[in-house]
Amino acid sequence: MVLYNGQFKSYDFNNYHKKRQHRKGKNVKKYYDDIFTFDIETTSAWVNEHGNVIKYKRGKSSEYWNSLQPLSICYIWMFGVNDVVYYGRTLESFYEMLGDLPQDGKIIIWVHNLSWEAHFLFNILTGVKMFCRTPHKPMKLTCDDFPNIELRCSYMLTRLSLANWGKSLGVKKLTGDLEYNKIRTPITPLTEKELGYCERDCIVVYEGIKNYLKQYGRQEEIPLTQTGTVRRVVKEKLMEDEAYNKFIKTLVPHNAKEYKMLQHVFAGGYTHANRMHAGKIIRERGEHYDFTSDYPFQLCARKYPFTPWAYIPDKTIPDENTYNDVAYIMELKFTELRCETCNSYIQVVKCSTDSRITRSDNGRVLEASELSITITEQDWLIIKNMYSFKSVEVIKLYKSYKQYLPKPFIEYVLELYGNKTSLKDLEDTLSVELYKKSKEHINALFGMTVTALLQSDIIFDEETLEWKIDKLTESRVNEHLDKLRNFNQREKRYFLSYSWGIYCTAYARVSLFMCLLGSDLINTTVADTSENYKDDVELYADTDSLFLLGSHDFSWYNKWCNDRLIEMCKYHKIDFAKTRPKTKKGKEKPLGYFLREADFIEFRTLGAKRYCERRTDGKLYITISGINKEAVYMLKNDIANFKNDFVFDKDFPTVTKKLPIYISNMPAVTYPDGYKANYKSGVALRPNGYKMHIDDNYSKLIKYAEIESGDLPETFVNSMRGKWV
């Protein structure tokens, strides 16, 4: 790594290309082709109650650290030109270096996690402009000082940590060389080992962007996000057909009100704990089942809304026998609604504000005297098999005729699934790269279908360093929808229907409840059960998986998957074998199957995204949103410690959760080594733990978990948990 001392003033930046801004235009722009990378290392510190600058120390409470003024400072920056990395020690010297770069052409600088670096650059740049979807998270950044320079976030492109990105590239990211709690400033001496760590981060990004150039050719052609990489491929496959271009524009929502309705109807995966077992320590053998690429299966095997949504004046719930060919959105009003199963489905947040919900189950409705909700016909299949009610009234009803998704789209899904299956564990370079690419793309396909058609503007105030969201107005949404609907051939931003994403997750929820309730849910009610009924032995559900007591057979569901795929393949004239590619060992892996994973012998859940299991290998495993798996060691190999109010200590060695603290009003301070800093903006980072707390309402619902079965009548305990049968 080379100390920067004005070398770029005489550097020959002769690696560039020129291209027209428009196909027939005369405006030609120059782009520099060297791969430029940027990274910083920072110190977090705090001003204590005595006015001293201190480093983070273990043993103090979060409340203590929250009471102190946080500080942060950049003590070294690195700037890579291809595989040569330069460095400096102050932000001001980085500003000077930017001024030494060429000014006559576009320069893209890649930054891994730009949201971090940006908050330090605010101290030196003026006229900052950013493209963001959420506050503090810019995807790209420009400024008035150097208008030809664009900083791009490579993390948004990869969604990988530097360590994992480097690993996938065969470039090892050095770890463990920097003591992050040590206070360093621009005058702190750094060892060769520490400098080597700093250099490696830029090298990883350089190798990563070089790899992307194999696909995209030019840096300006690389998409901003991971989803953007697959969006481009799918768009090219679909929009080359002019007839499709015209057709898809007919599916743009009519207006802002329809778009808002569709957004409200959308719901993600079903993640919930069975209230009859929540809180209990289960010491029985059970099975864990998981759908094989669930969303890709739903995209291939099911039919989707293919005509504009049309209002119909009917006031009765449509015949379920039409659901395969017609999509419905219904606004329904229930009276005296009650959940009759061990699991509850209706989300409280999806109900209208005038609903009278009298009892809930961790965010889902158990009882309501009145309830209004807007749902799809797929949601209705689940609700009428789980809830009883005195009456249901159709307030509004819309319909759209269904069809399979376009053949090129389905073929691409199957191609990615085939690559992901057949190339896994192969070691040659081509197979490894294609496997990685296929896995990334197939995971991004669903996200692409539910991307918001229009984002709220994120506004950054350069004077106050504050962020705010400029909410969308109805007129602005209508204006944007009109543009998307423009039949001008060049308008190709809308190439997948937003409704398709809504139905992908709706179908996935139906598949989960088919396996839970033991039928296809058509023409059945809450009173009907089958030999495949699992609701009472299910412990936990998470989007595409179930944890169940006992031994089970889902071959009936897997046959149902086959039948759906056979029908689709027959319609589109696709080889059915593509839905069941073979692994490295020659074993078929059919798309969509519900397959058994590792069994468990102990299990406990405290609600959504919070469960602990002991598998047959004897080890404990935890799944807690925001907490790393290694934190399980705090439980001391005892599942009984996984309980309400248990604290995953922020200072425990295997708890790696961090809390970023965005600072916009840092005071001028003198650090312990005498360095005087007068920066306003930065980000401090400190360890952050997690307390497993159950809210009062949910606690009351499941509080009888610890009572021995003989202490109270079973019917009473069940009724307290909301089961009346």
What residues fall within each predicted segment?
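Ser/Thr-glycine-rich phosphate-binding loops at phosphate-binding pockets of nucleotides
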Residues: 39-47
